[in-house]
Amino acid sequence: MTPLSSPLSQYWQTVVERLPEGFTETSLSVQAKSVLTFSDFALDSVIAHPEWLAELESASPQADEWRHYAGWLQEALAGVCDDASLMRELRFFRRRIMVRIAWAQTLSLVDDETILQQLSHLAETLIVGARDWLYAACCREWGTPCNPQGVPQPLLILGMGKLGGGELNFSSDIDLIFAWPEHGETRGGRRELDNAQFFTRLGQRLIKALDQPTMDGFVYRVDMRLRPFGDSGPLVLSFAALEDYYQEQGRDWERYAMVKARLMGDNDDAWSRELRAMLRPFVFRRYIDFSVIQSLRNMKGMIAREVRRRGLKDNIKLGAGGIREIEFIVQVFQLIRGGREPSLQSRSLLPTLDAIAALHLLPENDVAQLRVAYLFLRRLENLLQSINDEQTQTLPADDLNRARLAWGMKAENWPQLVGELTDHMANVRRVFNELIGDDEADTPQEEERSEPWRDVWQDALQEDDSTPVLAHLADEDRRQVLTLIADFRKELDKRPIGPRGRQVLDQLMPHLLADVCSREDAAVTLSRITPLLAGIVTRTTYLELLSEFPGALKHLIMLCAASPMIASQLARYPLLLDELLDPGTLYQPTATDAYRDELRQYLLRVPEEDEEQQLEALRQFKQAQLLRIAAADIAGTLPVMKVSDHLTWLAEAMIDAVVQQAWTQMVARYGQPAHLDERQGRGFAVVGYGKLGGWELGYSSDLDLIFLHDCPMDVMTNGEREIDGRQFYLRLAQRIMHLFSTRTSSGILYEVDARLRPSGAAGMLVTSADAFADYQQHEAWTWEHQALVRARVVYGDPQLTSQFDTVRRTIMTTARDGKTLQTEVREMREKMRAHLGNKHRDRFDIKADEGGITDIEFIAQYLVLRYAHEKPKLTRWSDNVRILELLAQNGIMDEHEAQALTVAYTTLRDELHHLALQELPGHVAQTCFSKERALVQASWRKWLVAV
C-alpha cells in the first residue's frame, strides 16, 4: 500500500482528534489510518458506529461479499413493523455497506470492476428489499392485485443507466421505471382497488422509502423521469401501456436509455421474460441502423456545448474525452449492429467493448486504450465521490482533496495525476471524433448566439444557470419563460412525434428561443407561440418550414408578439404558415377590387364537384387573407378605415363564392326556376346589414344578412326533380347558411345572423322583393328603418339591386314627425343600453356605453330618417363616415361637429380593432377617450334630447 503523502500525514493529526472512544492512533492498522484520512464519509460513519470500524479491522471486505447483501438485508428487515422503521433500517444498511465498499476501494482490496458491481448490487438489493416489504404491506391493506384470471400481479422495476448496467458510481441517483403486467383488481383486502391504483400507491411509498431525507439521511435519490411521458405520465404503467408507448412514440434517446435497462431482482419468471421480450425489438433493430450516428452526433453536440458553456475541462464525466464519450462510442455499435450481433447486447460497457474488439469494429489498440481510460476514469470518479459521499464529477480545487486523489490513484502528486488523466482523455477524444465525427453545422456566430438557448431547450441548465441568458428579464418573466419551456417539453412527451420531427424541433427551438427571449416581452410572446408549436409538432413539414426559412420564423415571432389573435389563428390553422414565406405579399393585402378574382383563381385548384375540398378552400383563403390584413394593420400600412374596407371586400368575395356553390348544387338537383329562362341572372340577392352593410367589419364580426328573390307565384323549377320556385329559393338560402356555418378542419367561414329579415326569426328565411317592400312600408318598426340606413346589396342581380335600393330610398325619405322619431330612437337606445350595457362599472364599453360608437351610429341614423325627405342625397351611403359627410354637405350638421364625430368614431373603431388583435374585450379604463366621449354625449343631447 502506498504510504500517505506529506499533506495527508499532516491531516491525519486532525483525524486522530476525532477518533471514536476506544480507538487510538497506535491501536489502528495502517489500512484504517489510510481510509479514515482519505474519506471524511468513512470517518463520520465510524465515529457514529464504532462497531463498524472494529468489524473492518478484524476482517477486511471481500470481493464476492455482494452475494450476501440480500441475506444481510433480510435479517435487518426481520423486525421492521412499519414504514418508518423500514426507512430507518434501509438507511442504516446502505451506510454500513457503503463504508465497507469505500474501505475496499480506497485500499484497492478489490478491483475496480468489482467495486462497480458491488455498488450496483447494493442498490438493487435495497430497491428489491424495500419493494418486497412494501408490496406485502400494501397487500395486507388493500388485497393482492390480480388479473381477471386471479393470478397475482407483481411490481416490476427496471433499473436504468449505470444501475441497469451494473456500473453504478459511489454517490449516484438511481433511474427507475415501474411496470405491472395486466389490469385487474385487488382481492382479499379490506377494500378493493384496481391494479393501477394499487401499484401507483405502492410506487409512491417505495420512492418515499428510498428518497425521502430523514435524520438518518436517504437511501438513493430516485429519478423517475425516464418513464414514458416523464413527470407528466403515470407513475406505473401496465405492460400494454408500455408496449403502446415504445412502439408508437419511443424516441431515440429512450432507445439509448433502454440499452442498459435491467429488471431489478433478475427474476426469470414469466412476467419478467414477457417484459424483456417486449422491450427488445424497440432497443435493437433487426436491420443495421445508421441513423443512430446522426442522433448521437446531435447528443455529442449538446455535450460539447455544455463543456464550452460551463468550462467543464475539469469534469471527468462530461468533459472532452470523459466517461460519457466512452459510453457514446460503445452505444454507437450497440444501436447500429446490436440487432444482428447478440454479443453487442450486453448492458455493461466493458463486456460490450470486448465484443467490439472481437467483431473487429474498432482497432485492438483503440479498444485497449478505451478500456484502460474507462477504468481509470471510473476509479477516479468513485474515489472523488467517496470523500464526502457527494455526487460530483468535477476535480477538486483544494490541496487536501487533490492530495487525497493523487494518493488514491497511486500518483506521486497532483500534476502527475493530471498528466495521466489528460493522456487518457485525449485518447478517448480521438476515437470519439473519428467515430462520431464533428458536425458543427452552424456558423460560429449562429453557434455563439444559439448555444445558451440550446441548453435551455435541452433542459440542461441547472436552476440558477439560466440567469445570464435571461438576465434582461424581470424575475417573474424569467420564471415564466422557463416554466413555459418546461411545460412545452412535457406536452411534447405526450405527442406521437417521429424521429425526424424531434430532430427538426431540436434544430428549430434554439433559434426560436434566441429570437423570442431577446425581447422584453419574451414571456408573453413565448406563451403565444408554444400553443402553435404544440399544434404542429406532429406535422414535420411545418417545423421544417420554420427551421429552414429564418425569415418566416422572424415574421412568426413578430406577428405573435403583436397579436394573440394572429397567434391563435396560426395555431388553429398551421397552413397559414406558408403565408410567412413572402413578406412582399404578407404585408400587402389584396387590392380591394381583386378579392373576387383572387378567390376564383384559388378555387380553380379544387375540383368543383368536391364539396368538402371546396369548403376547405374557402376557409383557407379567408384565413390567409385575414392574416395579411392583420399583418398590414400591425405594420401600420393600413389605417382603420382601410382595414374595414379590406375585411368587407373579403366578406363580399366569400358571399359571392358561397352563393355560387349553393346555386350550382341546387340547380344540379332541381334545375333553376322557370322565370329565369327568358332573362339573365338568378333572381336572387343578399343584403348586408350592420357592419357589413356599413363597410365597418372587424376581424371577428359576424355577417347580418337577409335574402331576397323576385320569383312570381306558381313558378316551378325546370329540372327532373321540379319543385316550387319559392321553395327553391328557400332551400338555396338554407344551403348558403349551411355552407357558411359548416365546421371543417379549417373551422367555419362566418357566423351568419339572418334575424333582421322581415318578422325576424319568425319570418321566412328568404323573402320576395315585393313582400320586403310591403313589410318595410306597413309593418316595420322604427329600429328596422334605422337598420335599413346601414343596409345594401352585397350580392345580387342588377334588377333586384335596383329594386332594393328603391325600397330603401322610399322608406328613408318618408316624412316623419320629428318629435316622435326622436323619442323612438332615444328609447330604443336606452333599451339597448339597459340590455347590452357595460357590466363593468369601472370600465368604458367602447361600443355600448354613453359616448361610444353606438351613440354615434344612432345620431347618424336619426338624422337621415329625420331629414332625408328634405335631402334625398342623405340616402346615398350606408357607412357612418360618409353619412356624417353628407349631413355636413347638406347643411344638417355643422361641419366642425361632423368632423369631430368622424374623428371620435374612427378613433374608437381603431381601438376596437387593436383590442381584437389582442383578443381583449371591447372595454377600457373609464379615463380613456374622455374627450371623444364628451363630444359624442354633447351631440347626443343636442339631437336626441333637446326639445
Curated annotation (Swiss-Prot):
EC main group: transferase
CC terms in the record's Gene Ontology section: cytosol
Gene Ontology annotations of biological process type: regulation of glutamine family amino acid metabolic process
Cofactor: Mg(2+)
Region of interest: Adenylyl removase: 1-440
Catalysed conversion reaction: [glutamine synthetase]-O(4)-(5'-adenylyl)-L-tyrosine + phosphate = [glutamine synthetase]-L-tyrosine + ADP; [glutamine synthetase]-L-tyrosine + ATP = [glutamine synthetase]-O(4)-(5'-adenylyl)-L-tyrosine + diphosphate
Pfam families: GlnD_UR_UTase, GlnE
Signal peptide (from-to): none
SUPFAM superfamilies for the chain: Nucleotidyltransferase, Nucleotidyltransferase substrate binding subunit/domain
EC number: 2.7.7.89, 2.7.7.42
Keywords attached to this entry: ATP-binding, Magnesium, Multifunctional enzyme, Nucleotide-binding, Nucleotidyltransferase, Transferase
Region (Adenylyl transferase): 450-947
GO MF terms held by the record: [glutamate-ammonia-ligase] adenylyltransferase activity; [glutamine synthetase]-adenylyl-L-tyrosine phosphorylase activity; ATP binding; magnesium ion binding
NCBIfam families per UniProt: PRK11072.1
Function: Involved in the regulation of glutamine synthetase GlnA, a key enzyme in the process to assimilate ammonia. When cellular nitrogen levels are high, the C-terminal adenylyl transferase (AT) inactivates GlnA by covalent transfer of an adenylyl group from ATP to specific tyrosine residue of GlnA, thus reducing its activity. Conversely, when nitrogen levels are low, the N-terminal adenylyl removase (AR) activates GlnA by removing the adenylyl group by phosphorolysis, increasing its activity.
The family this protein is said to belong to: Belongs to the GlnE family.
HAMAP family in the record: GlnE
Name the record gives this protein: Bifunctional glutamine synthetase adenylyltransferase/adenylyl-removing enzyme
